[in-house]
Amino acid sequence: MKIGILSRNSKLYSTSRLVEAARERGHEPRVVDVLKCYMNITTNAPTVRYRSSGVSEELQFDAVIPRIGASVTTYGCAVLRQFEVSGVYSINESIAITRSRDKLRAHQLLARKGVGQPVTSYAHSADATNDLIESVNGAPLIVKVMASTHGNGVVLAETDKAAETLINAFRGLKADFLVQEFIKEAGGSDIRCFVIGDKVVAAMQRTAQPGEFRSNLHRGGSAQVVKLRPNERRLAVQAAQVMGLDLAGVDIIRSSHGPLVLEVNSSPGLKGIESATNKDIAGAIIDYIVKDVLNGPNKPKGKG
């Protein structure tokens, strides 16, 4: 099977592991930089072409694995959509990726389906600042920039006054942001659930460094294998399905009123989860694709 891996850097751990796992199983993987792709949008004959080293060629794959960075979401999803209309299978569809990348939209979709998550508020008017703070039960609270990744642009406000100052500062920078309740009892830990299809294939607990509330591994957090409770497994799978994702990293947090979803990641990294659990996650992804391709082209999943 010819498998295209849409990634801007073939040396990244996740990308190289997918290449390795595909080759081990006798497939033909190829890493493709989406920014070097261009589309021929012709009625009844849509194609994706690739220009590298001065040579242009039509790309033909049986399946693609999107590893599209947040900074190139719009163009990357346009390329992926072109593969989709050409009948190429993708483990995650472009519409599902765009749902999950829009933090506000994702929270709205999860809320509509009854998926537990921290109380979240959003407003445009400066007149609503106090209402935002009150709606999440006051400080301490989290202010999260919509475009944040790896914990960047996520700030803890310890007091209502600090929250007001922070919100006004973000407004002054024309930043789009959410205000979210702070789950103190989580103690700076969250759980990354790695979902493939309708199963959680691995999970790790991430713990923040002392004095830090963000548990992201990119910010120096530590990771260890964790045993999930049945309701946590169900929640993670449900969250991925609401987004329409067959491959997802679902971040959940343990609160006094049950597990809550923090975020659904459509392009979860493999290094942390494979290191913590000692599982061949890359191989599980390839195995799932091979099995799912037999079911035919993608059918849109999720709504909204």
Curated annotation (Swiss-Prot):
Its EC number is 6.3.2.-. Keywords: ATP-binding, Ligase, Magnesium, Manganese, Metal-binding, Nucleotide-binding, Protein biosynthesis. One of its GO terms (cellular component) is cytoplasm. The keyword Transmembrane does not apply. GO terms for molecular function: ATP binding; metal ion binding; ribosomal S6-glutamic acid ligase activity. GO terms for biological process: protein modification process; SOS response; translation. It is an enzyme of class 6 (ligase). Mn(2+) 2 binds at residues 263, 265. The keyword ATP-binding applies. Mg(2+) 1 binds at residues 251, 263. Its cofactor is Mg(2+); Mn(2+). Mg(2+) 2 binds at residues 263, 265. Binds 2 magnesium or manganese ions per subunit. ATP binds at residues 144, 181-182, 190, 214-216. Pfam families: RimK (PF08443), Rimk_N (PF18030). Residues 107-290 form the ATP-grasp domain. Mn(2+) 1 binds at residues 251, 263. NCBIfam families: PRK10446.1, rimK_fam. Belongs to the RimK family. This is Probable alpha-L-glutamate ligase 2. The gene is rimK2.
